[in-house]
């Protein structure tokens, strides 16, 4: 095999590893991905009817306060000044999210100062001691009070998890942000924006190196016997699948997308609209044209929308969010022990660590793996730490 390193998975984690090893160390890197495209879940493509760029696997919004990550990603793309804002429909009314002073004033039907709103929410939240919360519902009430919880958390959570919040682990919502001002930016990071030319153009530049060989629609497991033991591997696929689900499958939630072209220039006036009512089957609607208002070539008489439906992932589904039950955590410990014994294989990324990672987190984690493990091995002759999960 004419490769110094094999990377399994062409998402942000895998491509960051491949790019660093090829550009900085001059290594020959073979990247394998079972899909027909690179970029993992950040992959985007133009809708065939409207030409509007669609985030195929759901909305991807780049944001970070990590200077190292920002310096790295801006080598490959310029970013628009897009700032993400989310709204939620409840009982036919629209509220800004996350909960802020505008949300509170609109919901309770009166103007309040920051101190008045803070005191009211604290009084309502005092119904339950957060330290004693036995489930997600009790935790939610202890954080924002019953009225706001019932309005904006309960129904949405029920749809997102298909489980009564009274039966969910309180750790799922360790905090619920409430802003006592009128700031409705969704993220608070120093840097935020969307790649000017789209995500696929961005990741294509990362992979554009003569030493990087990307092979799509290629299953690592069909070639693992030829790879393992012959060349180091960075594996970003599901950690349970790597070990043949020997400790059992880890549980995930998946998302079904329903794409539709509407014969209007603007369907909802914003990129993401949540639906908090329990009787609405989808959790939110994405209208991708609003991600790039600077693009004047989008049609003014058509738009594309994507409805999101959340459910438990079954065999063959795309895993999105780790459910992370106590049973899952026990299985993960077994897989981590197995990973430590796997020679010359490093596990990383969302699937490889069973952690939900935003894009900047995946990139940052990959940069750390490169600096702390791969670079010392290939450039300094240090032994590659056998196995282990990059955390």
Which residues make up each language-model segment?
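Short alpha-helical segment within the catalytic ATP-binding CA
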Residues: 16
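Mid-domain catalytic core of redox enzymes
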Residues: 24, 218-338
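Conserved flavin/dinucleotide-binding core of flavoenzymes
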Residues: 46, 286-391
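Beta1/beta-strand and adjacent pyrophosphate-binding region of the FAD-binding site
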Residues: 1-13, 30
């Amino acid at each position: 095999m004419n490769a110094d390193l094999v990377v399994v998975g062409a998402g942000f984690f895998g491509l960051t590893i491949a790019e660093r090893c090829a550009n900085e160390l001059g290594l020959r890197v073979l990247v394998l991905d079972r899909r027909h495209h690179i970029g993992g879940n950040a992959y985007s493509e133009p809708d065939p009817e409207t030409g509007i760029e669609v985030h195929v696997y759901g909305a991807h919004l780049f944001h970070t306060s990590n200077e190292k990550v920002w310096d790295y990603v801006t080598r490959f793309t310029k970013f628009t000044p897009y700032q993400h804002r989310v709204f939620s429909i409840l009982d036919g009314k629209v509220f800004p999210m996350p909960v802020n002073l505008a949300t509170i004033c609109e919901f309770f039907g009166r103007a309040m100062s920051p101190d008045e709103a803070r005191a009211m929410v604290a009084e309502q939240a005092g119904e339950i001691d957060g330290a004693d919360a036995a489930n997600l519902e009790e935790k939610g009430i202890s954080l924002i009070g019953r009225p706001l919880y019932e309005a904006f958390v309960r129904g949405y959570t029920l749809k997102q998890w298909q489980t009564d919040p009274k039966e969910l682990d309180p750790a799922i919502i360790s905090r619920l942000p409430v802003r006592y001002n009128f700031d409705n930016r969704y993220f608070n990071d120093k840097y935020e924006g969307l790649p000017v030319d789209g995500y696929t153009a961005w990741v294509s530049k990362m992979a554009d190196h003569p030493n990087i060989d990307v092979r799509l629609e290629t299953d690592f497991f069909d070639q693992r016997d030829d790879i393992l033991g012959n060349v180091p591997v960075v594996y970003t696929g599901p950690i349970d699948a790597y070990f043949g689900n020997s400790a059992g499958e880890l549980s995930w939630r998946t998302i079904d997308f329903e794409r539709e072209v509407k014969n209007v220039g603007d369907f909802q006036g914003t990129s993401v609209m949540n639906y908090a009512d329990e009787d609405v089957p989808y959790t939110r609607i994405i209208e991708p044209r609003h991600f790039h208002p600077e693009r004047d070539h989008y049609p003014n008489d058509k738009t594309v929308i994507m409805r999101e439906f959340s459910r438990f992932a079954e065999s063959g589904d795309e895993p999105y969010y780790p459910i992370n039950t106590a049973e899952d955590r026990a299985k993960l410990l077994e897989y981590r022990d197995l990973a430590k014994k796997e020679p010359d294989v490093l596990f990383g990324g969302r699937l490889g660590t069973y952690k939900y990672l935003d894009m900047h987190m995946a990139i940052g984690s990959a940069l750390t793996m490169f600096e702390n493990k791969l670079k010392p091995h290939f450039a300094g002759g240090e032994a590659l730490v056998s196995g282990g999960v990059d955390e």
